[in-house]
Swiss-Prot record:
Family the entry assigns: Belongs to the SepF family.
Region (Disordered), start-end ranges: 16-43
Protein localization: Cytoplasm
Species annotation: Levilactobacillus brevis (strain ATCC 367 / BCRC 12310 / CIP 105137 / JCM 1170 / LMG 11437 / NCIMB 947 / NCTC 947)
BP terms from Gene Ontology: division septum assembly; FtsZ-dependent cytokinesis
The keyword Cytoplasm appears for this protein: yes
Complex and partners: Homodimer. Interacts with FtsZ.
Predominant subcellular localization, coarse grouping: cytoplasm
UniProt name for this protein: Cell division protein SepF
The keyword Cell division is assigned to this record: yes
An example Gene Ontology CC term for this record: cytoplasm
InterPro entries, A to Z: Cell_div_SepF, Cell_div_SepF/SepF-rel, SepF-like_sf
Function noted in UniProt: Cell division protein that is part of the divisome complex and is recruited early to the Z-ring. Probably stimulates Z-ring formation, perhaps through the cross-linking of FtsZ protofilaments. Its function overlaps with FtsA.
Amino acid sequence: MAEKFSLSKFFGMNDEYDDDYAEEPTPATKSTPTPPTRPNDSRKVVAMRTAKPNASHIAICEPRIYSDAKSIAKQLTNGDAVIVNFARVDEAQAQRIVDFLNGTAYAVGGEIKRIGEQIFLCTPHNFEVSGDVAANLGTQVTR
């Protein structure tokens, strides 16, 4: 009678267990590994660059159309000061933008100041501005 074909016999593997192999007994209790200890070093490590949580930010904007006032107002409501240069808009548009920013500054408890012929500084409540540049706009310094 013909012997039954088996893949394990074809590849030389025996179906019987190898008696030489013995399983290692498993320990009943496992020991938890201890973390490696560092040598006691008295020096302190300090980061050179630290983040400033209360860092102030001043943005500079030059609006060209009235709809640019929305992005300026968003920066103001986010707590950033904004310097606005109205050199590229006509006088009527500039007046509308200043009126809008006046309302925004009032809403956030801030203020708006003229610091140049066509330049305004809009600040939220957490900025303090000292000095008055607008009083000196009409006078020129001659040497």
